[in-house]
Amino acid sequence: MATSTMSVCSSAYSDSWQVDACPESCCEPPCCATSCCAPAPCLTLVCTPVSCVSSPCCQAACEPSPCQSGCTSSCTPSCCQQSSCQPACCTSSPCQQACCVPVCCKPVCCVPVCCKPVCCKPICCVPVCSGASSSCCQQSSRQPACCTTSCCRPSSSVSLLCRPVCRSTCCVPIPSCCAPASTCQPSCCRPASCVSLLCRPTCSRLSSACCGLSSGQKSSC
């Protein structure tokens, strides 16, 4: 498919057919000239637009590096949904912000080596935590409401879901953190409860009233 053979290609400026030394696939790099890329052959896995002649994105997508700036700047969402802006874009080079927008970069192409918080939004792919990056552990739908960035230790970075490992600062008596019991007092929230991803409070033995109201707690707590 990559070899150059004598193929039948239609002219972009006439309805006549001519024999030209074009690769079998119209949208391979040597064949992206306007005289070779006709509307019909361009409906391939690489060139998604109807016509390579009228689409500057298709021209750039035919180059060895699919997600160059020339492609992403002129690319429409319909052009980037197929393979031209997928894994090669996010794996061969670090994810660029113009590349990893939700319409272009699918979760399959956001690998840990390329996913940086600045380029891979949660809708595109889940960020991969790094010890020096606290922006990964910001509030999101995947994290408990009571866990802030100060709860995220580097040890939580092993999870692709970026689930934070809570520190004692996480278990402050926040209503959404301290179980359903509305009468839960600060004495109910001990640092030991922070081993839970949900930051549910561990009842203090001195606060039997709170122990009785907190769901999921043992009555002998």
UniProtKB/Swiss-Prot annotation:
Question: Where would I find the sequence repeats?
Answer: 26-30, 31-35, 36-40, 57-61, 79-83, 89-93, 99-103, 104-108, 109-113, 114-118, 119-123, 124-128, 136-140, 146-150, 151-155, 177-181, 188-192, 210-214
Q: Where is this region: 18 X 5 AA repeats of C-C-X(3)?
A: 26-214
Give the top-rank taxon of the lineage listed in the UniProt record for this protein.
Answer: Eukaryota
One GO CC term, this protein: keratin filament
Keywords annotated in UniProt: Keratin, Repeat
Organs and tissues of expression: Restricted to a narrow region of the hair fiber cuticle, lying approximately 20 cell layers above the apex of the dermal papilla of the hair root; not detected in any other tissues.
**What Pfam families has UniProt attached to this entry?**
Keratin_B2_2
The family line of this record is: Belongs to the KRTAP type 10 family.
Which PANTHER family is this protein grouped with?
KERATIN ASSOCIATED PROTEIN, KERATIN-ASSOCIATED PROTEIN 10-3
What exactly does this protein do?
In the hair cortex, hair keratin intermediate filaments are embedded in an interfilamentous matrix, consisting of hair keratin-associated proteins (KRTAP), which are essential for the formation of a rigid and resistant hair shaft through their extensive disulfide bond cross-linking with abundant cysteine residues of hair keratins. The matrix proteins include the high-sulfur and high-glycine-tyrosine keratins.
Assembly with partners or alone: Interacts with hair keratins.
This one is known as Keratin-associated protein 10-3
This protein's species is: Homo sapiens
